[in-house]
Regions:
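Bacterial N-terminal signal peptides that target proteins for export
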Residues: 2-13
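Generic extreme N-terminus detector
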Residues: 5, 22-23
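Cysteine endopeptidase catalytic domains of the caspase/legumain-like
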Residues: 23-254
Length: 254
């Protein structure tokens, strides 16, 4: 009887440990800052974009329904340089090592940076270095930037196509909608840009080829890239850049 009771205790302890490990793999907070700029203060410099607000709202909606997420959406006049940087610094600084931080931007891009609501010259953009510094200061292991913007591939001079050798942990994954010098395409009759549309499909499970309910960086790239290239007739080539493990989980599928 003592042996049976002892074995039951061991089984109970083992079961609790398994449950704890399983819980820890999902027990995280995903901090999301989603910026959409469909209209700018100076439309002669930055003309309206039909899909940017829809992009930001759609991504925000996805993560609002995502377990353990905190979502912050900034649209049009609320997406000033000062406000974007403040929200990024404030919210991402709250993250811990087991959390994930995601910055999503849909709007006009420029070589080396992203435009803000009041952008009229280079002094009023947000540079990639500024974003990267904020991301790197976070304790989170998983750090992701999704940039839907023309010339977004020029956010970094080292922007290359996918490089599976980049496996340094706790770095920033930058996924841009186009190569340097390329336009990122959208249509006025669409709610979302081609890039964000394909990303959302991937997030909902279309990219989960091995059916493990996880979308990794590799799976995201493999799903999104050929489809965006096809959608745009070969005129747009998304770029995945950074030092990270290609098996890094971007999202879990419900």
């Amino acid at each position: 009887m003592k042996l049976i009771a002892y074995n039951k205790q061991l089984f109970t302890v083992a079961l609790l440990l398994m449950m704890l490990c399983s819980f820890n793999s999902y027990a995280q907070i995903t901090y999301v800052v989603s910026v959409g700029l469909g209209e700018y203060k100076y439309p002669d410099i930055a003309p309206p974009l039909p899909c940017s607000l829809g992009d930001a709202r759609a991504v925000s909606h996805f993560f609002h329904n995502y377990n353990g997420s905190k979502v912050f959406m900034l649209l049009n006049e609320n997406a000033t340089r000062k406000h974007i940087l403040k929200v990024l610094r404030t919210e991402f600084s709250k993250s811990t090592v087991n959390d994930e931080i995601i910055f999503v931007f849909s709007g006009h891009g420029i070589q080396g940076g992203l435009t803000c609501y009041e952008t009229k010259d280079m002094s009023s953009i947000i540079t990639y270095n500024e974003i990267q510094d904020i991301m790197k200061s976070s304790k989170a292991r998983r750090k992701i930037i999704l940039a839907m913007a023309c010339y977004s591939g020029g956010l970094t001079l080292k922007s290359n196509n996918y490089n599976k050798k980049n496996t340094e942990k706790s770095s920033v994954m930058l996924y841009t909608s186009s190569r340097p010098g390329e336009v990122s395409w959208e249509r006025s009759d669409m709610n979302n840009s081609f890039f964000i549309s394909r990303i959302l499909q991937a997030f909902h499970g279309a990219a989960d080829k091995n059916s493990d309910r996880k979308i990794t960086a590799r799976e995201l790239f493999n799903y999104v890239n050929p489809r965006v290239i096809g959608d745009t007739g070969g005129r747009q080539h998304p770029q995945l850049w950074g030092k990270f493990d290609d098996s890094m989980v971007v999202v879990y599928v419900k």
